[in-house]
């Protein structure tokens, strides 16, 4: 075994297998862009009235997971957890974030869906650091 292969083998043994598209996974709360059905910024999750588009996506989609940024206060994402429970959708609160992400909520499918428009582009979104 060459030194390069040996080093890679040892690195994976110590730190786990290599991760594909790590920057994308950091942004989308552990998921990949190609799997995202809908994403909200932290500011959008903090909005007092939950988005109907989130409810519709949870109702009308199969094999999805609701990913929630654990940096947010429970009160801000509680309505979305209730929506997920009403519609039988699994959810995860992602709190082991090593990197900052402007996203507060992501609805991700188990397989690639390649949606072009994944953001709700309202005033709150336009004030965020994300650009479509």
Label each region the model flagged:
Residues 1-46:
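N-terminal, charge-rich interaction modules
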Residues 22-28, 70-78, 97-104:
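Glycine/charge-rich, flexible interdomain linkers and switch-proximal surface loops
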Residues 58-74:
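Extracellular/luminal Protease-associated
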Residues 56-61, 83, 87:
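Conserved, well-folded catalytic cores of nucleic-acid-processing
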Residues 51, 77-80:
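Conserved strand-to-helix beginnings and helix N-cap segments that scaffold or border functional pockets
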Residues 41-42, 69-70, 110:
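Structural motif
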Residues 81-132:
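Short basic, glycine-rich beta-strand/loop surfaces that mediate nucleic-acid
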Residues 39-59:
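Short, composition-biased local secondary-structure segments
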